[in-house]
Amino acid sequence: MWSLTASEGESTTAHFFLGAGDEGLGTRGIGMRPEESDSELLEDEEDEVPPEPQIIVGICAMTKKSKSKPMTQILERLCRFDYLTVIILGEDVILNEPVENWPSCHCLISFHSKGFPLDKAVAYSKLRNPFLINDLAMQYYIQDRREVYRILQEEGIDLPRYAVLNRDPARPEECNLIEGEDQVEVNGAVFPKPFVEKPVSAEDHNVYIYYPSSAGGGSQRLFRKIGSRSSVYSPESIVRKTGSYIYEEFMPTDGTDVKVYAVGPDYAHAEARKSPALDGKVERDSEGKEIRYPVMLTAMEKLVARKVCVAFRQTVCGFDLLRANGHSFVCDVNGFSFVKNSMKYYDDCAKILGNTIMRELAPQFQIPWSIPTEAEDIPIVPTTSGTMMELRCVIAIIRHGDRTPKQKMKMEVKHPRFFALFEKHGGYKTGKLKLKRPEQLQEVLDITRLLLAELEKEPGGEIEEKTGKLEQLKSVLEMYGHFSGINRKVQSTYYPHGVKASNEGQDPQRETLAPSLLLVLKWGGELTPAGRVQAEELGRAFRCMYPGGQGDYAGFPGCGLLRLHSTFRHDLKIYASDEGRVQMTAAAFAKGLLALEGELTPILVQMVKSANMNGLLDSDGDSLSSCQHRVKARLHHILQQDAPFGPEDYDELAPTRSTSLLNSMTVIQNPVKVCDQVFALIENLTHQIRERMQDPRSVDLQLYHSETLELMLQRWSKLERDFRQKSGRYDISKIPDIYDCVKYDVQHNGSLGLQGAAELLRLSKALADVVIPQEYGISREEKLEIAVGFCLPLLRKILLDLQRTHEDESVNKLHPLESHVHSLLSVFRYGGLLDETQDAQWQRALDYLSAISELNYMTQIVIMLYEDNTQDPLSEERFHVELHFSPGVKGVEEEGSAPAGCGFRPASSENEEMKTNEGSMENLCPGKASDEPDRALQTSPQPPEGPGLPRRSPLIRNRKAGSMEVLSETSSSRPGGYRLFSSSRPPTEMKQSGLGSQCTGLFSTTVLGGSFSAPNLQDYARSHGKKLPPASLKHRDELLFVPAVKRFSVSFAKHPTNGFEGCSMVPTIYPLETLHNALSLHQVSEFLSRVCQRHTDAQAQASAALFDSMHSSQASDNPFSPPRTLHSPPLQLQQRSEKPPWYSSGPSSTVSSAGPSSPTTVDGNSQFGFSDQPSLNSHVAEEHQGLGLLLETPGSGAQELSIEGEQELFEPNQSPQVPPVETSQPYEEVSQPCQEVPDISQPCQDISEALSQPCQEVPDISQQCQENHDNGNHTCQEVPHISQPCQKSSQLCQKVSEEVCQLCLENSEEVSQPCQGVSVEVGKLVHKFHVGVGSLVQETLVEVGSPAEEIPEEVIQPYQGFSVEVGRLAQEASAINLLSQGIPEIDKPSQEFPEEIDLQAQEVPEEIN
């Protein structure tokens, strides 16, 4: 490590020279000047010119470091300075010679590494007093993590929350450790798992991360890289008991660490690498070097780099950053370290060090030296500029994989122990309680055992009826011998007058009933090994979804999606609901997508965000809406009729005329008769299982996923009991469970050969195909109402991602519950996205969707956004959206019955166009062997030529034709194997470009009949390091097809990590079908806005009366959001927090902030509970093509910005004089800048109070003022509007700005206070405008011109040297414009914008101060 100490008050600077090695130590080395030849040097000597004075730079470090490649590269460049000579002290001299014998030097670069005698180096520096590049005394501190953390804390640099456990016999009070199952308490500080345990010595790299039992438990053990491993997963969950450690909070970082390399206080290079905690496998490129991804640092992170550099007095210094929740935390300081393999960095580093040394020492040597003007302006190293592709954003909504049957049991409990447990865990706050954690489930089990013991002693009384239920509760909780929150959960709901009375609506006054709890035990529903394989396969397939990827990522060619951006890990966001199977599916998907290895637990903890924490996948599923209750009642009524379906039943049950629904009703005919048959088949099934249990040969029979015959019988006999009620009527709600169970047994336990199972599957599927989709609404209106109720936050999230990704690329993966997938599809089908009578492609898509009977596991809805750079930024042609869909894994029904889609990205039949665009994806798919029938071509006609044709998909330009390199990631059956994409294009000629053109498998089309098994090919390609020639693929039928059994692939059974029991079959997944590929961004945005607005309008009307009575003076924060009371007390200046005043929440990546990292929303609607804590997420984009904001600069008043197409109004780093408007800063922290300038914070507070009231009175949409207000204080520049929402928002803008101006006029005394120029910014905040969103027109820009005074000098002072963060403003402009278009509080990860307009009024003045 290197430190810079300024000896005797000198400023720290550095110069380098290259010279003698070990053998030539006594003499001064000769400066190496590569540009001079030997003869020129000889001529110089012959002329006997007096030698120029030379500054000698000594390198004092271990040989391994001083002769390393980066050091050699930098020293060679340093020697190009005419007056610098470098000498390297040999290791022998350093270790064995006394310091008096060391050669003298004027400047010393010395740093500690293993075995280095730091004491001697310190003694040498005292003896010779050279100029030190890296301070030596501070290097003692860097070796102790406790000291590093102490110094960082003193400097106000953000750290993860931590506690030190010193096991020192002399100080026993510092060694208080209490370990629980899922947490540890260190000296009073509690750290719930996951947490990190670091040895106090910085030289000890054995860092352990402990995982919570809900994610599978165990720990990840990190160590210094050994070969290709940097960590290993261990099932051990107990912390180490010897040695001193630092315990700190685990930061969820999307699976990357950012390494920052500072050279002096003004230069920092950053790289991201895969976190060793993820799977422990080191990613290496073709040369065997660890793969790193360049990263852009934010202004805040550059400031952190400067602080670290100065605090530790190390000119050359490396440290580790964790980017989590929109913040950047320093977790390690490494001292002296160089970037590897970056020529740009070597040049910059040598230049900075040379200039530093010359600036410091040239005056002493009378060397004429003037620093080159550009020397200090070395640019921050940008990301690798790889050509920006047209694909801007991919949002995929994916259902979880294959799972065990879900089971549940309800029981009413009244025992005081259950009430005590309910109270203990805070159930009375909401009246509901969900218990999932192991210790909570253990408490339930303890109570159950106690009650059963009491019942044995004294049977009788009311509890007697529940003995069976208590027994079942006990057996389920004891089922696996250990608890994992992923398996089971207990929900309890409080009923003040008993469950029965509450449900039957009895009058509680008439009879006083005792309160009771309804206990619902849910178990099963675990992801099976097959489900895990499906998710991994799909992840691998997604990797190649984007054509044109020639990049080599971890040995896989053609990783298109990953090439969206070299820092793709920062853009990839994977959200999952809190269901264990959903989280595990998401982790397995991430594993496949990112080519990870090993256990799922570390991947789950690092990569998968729980979307329930922020409400993204929330829906109040437990309490059904009134509409759902009505629908369920009608559905049950229709299906209880013991008569064949008549025409009126078809009208009542299938008003949408869905093909699959009509087909199922035809199969059913008489619903009660079918239920009778189903019940008889279930009875027969349980009888067969009981017989099998009597058979001595079945004693040790293991079913799939470790199930036993007893458990299987329990599953079926419970359904048998519950399906037919005592009255003889059937419980229709059990039909999905019956289908679930029989599907599972036919697929996984077929070896039992149970008779009647196939018939039971056929009948239950027919019933389920009616019940499941119709539970989400029977008529179009009901379907839409229920759908939006389920997935409103999800819709807002999708809309927001689409709106923001024209700025940078993003990849979002959402893993929701089944209800969200059904609902989202309903929104697209019934919400009126397009008029199917006018659009032939959409009509075909709707026909296809209506023919799909089941949204099976791994169903995908994929939205892709493209940008055409050749189009005008404001035209509708600029941004283009495609909608794709796959119904998930193939069911067990016959192949022929599957509906045929339109193929993946179907193109028009204009051959000329096909020829000109040779790089298109379809052309990359090879022709099909002539003997293979084309299912899609036979069943779906080619689209006719003519005006109704959709436009061709925009395809990626900058790439060669046929450059696609794809290896199919699965093996599958011949007639329609696993393909990510299907296509109904006619076969085109095959291009002879090696394996690259053989994109069989993945995009394999219906045109191509199968896919080959990737693992073998990948291994082959990797070991032989070459592409397979086309000839080698001629006989791919014989070579590469894996025998398939009944459409199920067994390909992954041979993978040891997949944990297959026996040889279970993994169903293949239907390829993606394109629903539409000619949508404009404007169409989709308008559609989603309309749906959200309709829903919130309805809610607003429902609660309007309540709202008016509660708070008539305050209107909602924007026209379409559900009204709610806004409490805004006078703004208090907060206490100074530990965070430094300059701190702003940094992004998870500046380069690409499109994929929000943790969506939050402030929707007050109780149906979507969002976390109460304000998120600390915020995204900044430093490089932006965007329009800026009005910024007040001293002496210039308000600068007007013209609104022009792509014109950049000012550079991202415009001027150090302009204070950045950090509007996205969380309001917890905004007071800090104010405290920096105490003399003006008071007026600012006054004016905020004055401003907050008018800004709350934003009119509701119904009261929008229509007339244009023409006030002398406003300059309104109107841009032609295209859409209605724009007009509405401009009216809103005008209204707010009128009030702000009015306020300014009325409070002239306050306005004349020093802060007045700042408060006027509030008006502008409301009037930010949209940037570059294709067809969405830019908003009216309203400039509050009148009393704009200059910002006084002292206001600006704290912000000297900051760059204006244009990107952030542009993003917020986009975001706030969305708000004004009527999408209330879009849940917006990683970039908070103020929740209510009155909050904006309060925040902005403070922040600018």
UniProtKB/Swiss-Prot annotation:
Q: Which family does it belong to?
A: Belongs to the histidine acid phosphatase family. VIP1 subfamily.
Q: Name one GO biological process term.
A: inositol phosphate biosynthetic process
Catalysed transformations (reactions): 1D-myo-inositol hexakisphosphate + ATP = 1-diphospho-1D-myo-inositol 2,3,4,5,6-pentakisphosphate + ADP; 5-diphospho-1D-myo-inositol 1,2,3,4,6-pentakisphosphate + ATP + H(+) = 1,5-bis(diphospho)-1D-myo-inositol 2,3,4,6-tetrakisphosphate + ADP
Alphabetized PANTHER family for the sequence? DIPHOSPHOINOSITOL PENTAKISPHOSPHATE KINASE, INOSITOL HEXAKISPHOSPHATE AND DIPHOSPHOINOSITOL-PENTAKISPHOSPHATE KINASE 1
- Name the residue ranges with Polar residues bias: 981-996, 1110-1119, 1163-1178
Residues the record lists as binding substrate: 64-65, 224-225, 259, 273, 337-340
Any one GO MF term held by the record is: inositol hexakisphosphate kinase activity
Give yes or no: UniProt keyword Ribosomal protein: no
Record's GO cellular component terms: cytosol; plasma membrane
Q: Which domain of life is it from?
A: Eukaryota
Places the protein is found: Cytoplasm, Cytosol; Cell membrane
Q: What CDD domains does this protein's entry cite?
A: HP_HAP_like
Its name, as the record gives it, is: Inositol hexakisphosphate and diphosphoinositol-pentakisphosphate kinase 1
Residues annotated as region Polyphosphoinositide-binding domain? 382-453
Keyword terms: ATP-binding, Cell membrane, Cytoplasm, Kinase, Membrane, Nucleotide-binding, Phosphoprotein, Transferase
Known EC number: 2.7.4.24
Q: Where is the composition biased (Low complexity)?
A: 1144-1162
State the residue spans of region: Disordered.
891-996, 1110-1183
Give the residues the record marks as binding ATP: 145, 198, 205, 224, 248-251, 257-259, 275, 320, 332-334
Per the record, the domain comment is:
The C-terminal acid phosphatase-like domain binds PtdIns(3,4,5)P3 and InsP6. Despite its similarity with the phosphatase domain of histidine acid phosphatases, it has no phosphatase activity.
| Organism of origin | Pongo abelii
Q: Which pairs of positions does the record mark as disulfide bonds?
A: none
Function description: Bifunctional inositol kinase that acts in concert with the IP6K kinases IP6K1, IP6K2 and IP6K3 to synthesize the diphosphate group-containing inositol pyrophosphates diphosphoinositol pentakisphosphate, PP-InsP5, and bis-diphosphoinositol tetrakisphosphate, (PP)2-InsP4. PP-InsP5 and (PP)2-InsP4, also respectively called InsP7 and InsP8, regulate a variety of cellular processes, including apoptosis, vesicle trafficking, cytoskeletal dynamics, exocytosis, insulin signaling and neutrophil activation.
InterPro entries referenced in this protein's UniProt entry, alphabetically: Acid_Pase_AS, His_Pase_clade-2, His_Pase_VIP1, His_PPase_superfam, VIP1_N
